[in-house]
Amino acid sequence: MSYDYRRLVAVVDERVPALMARQIEDAEHPDEGGFVGVDGLAGPNQVSSAATFGYVYLLPESRHHGVEALVERVERAAAWGRRRRTAAGRFDLLVTNFDSSPDTGFTVQALAPVVRAARKAAAAGDAGAARISEALGELIHTAAPGMVAGGFHTPNHRWVLVSALSMAMELFPDLTDRVAPTIEAYLAETIDVNADGEFIERSTSVYNPVVDRSLRLAAESLERWDLLDPVRANLEMSYHLMHGDATVVTSVSIRQDRGAHAVPTGLADSYYTLARRDGN
């Protein structure tokens, strides 16, 4: 099947009404502007959902392109994020991780590309894009020192933090002195990939995709193209672990996907990006 960018835009467009319904609009509610997750909680890390509103506002192919109401929704979400973040600028994952630098890293991964795109549109005269860039960019800038200080919980989190800090530094060069030493310290540990292309958690359907994406994003922000080598190795290995029905072997995992019947859709963006880059 050929790749058609417009099909993906249409899929995102279809998700917008449901996301609007999840955003709390009651001005008297303490979580006004926030998003209610599948767990029924308005977890602070859900501020990353604002990225969808930003994307469809910015994408010319979207039927929501240029709709100012979406800018207002982004700003309300960002205001909620400012109210709910911790003193260190970090966000909670309410079901398990509090004041969490890795979950903040996942949030920055989601928001940074929108800020980058919004800046380009703002430079071309789009006032709404400038508002999106300012609202979401502030969350990223404030979060960076907290990610530096906060540490991580699991192996893949190192690379989530490396990518998030790299993206923050690319957007805000004034952060370089604070975040670059942490990036280099994590990278000095070397990537946890073996000769077969397997990462240490062996999580073929959940965390290997997270590592691949994180290393790829870091490579792009840092222009450290050697970081793509373990991604290539893992994607090659993962291909050989796929069954005919597109599910992947999960019996090797040491994480919660062990034994799951899963299609590794999280690998799709890395396969596509490396295929285009390498002509493979």
Put a short name on every predicted segment.
Residues M1-S48, E68, E72-R76, W80, ...:
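Low-complexity, Ser/Thr/Pro/Gly-enriched N-terminal "stalk/linker" regions
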Residues Y3-Y5, F53-Y57, F91, Y186, ...:
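Sequence-level detector for tyrosine residue identity
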Residues R6-V9, D13, P17-A21, G137, ...:
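Generic detector of well-ordered alpha-helical segments enriched in charged/polar residues
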Residues W225-N280:
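Extended polysaccharide-engagement surfaces of secreted carbohydrate-active enzymes
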Residues I24-F35, A87-R90, A195-G197, A246-T250:
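Glycine-centered small-residue hotspots that permit tight backbone geometry or close packing
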Residues V38-L228:
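Aromatic-lined, polymer-binding surfaces characteristic
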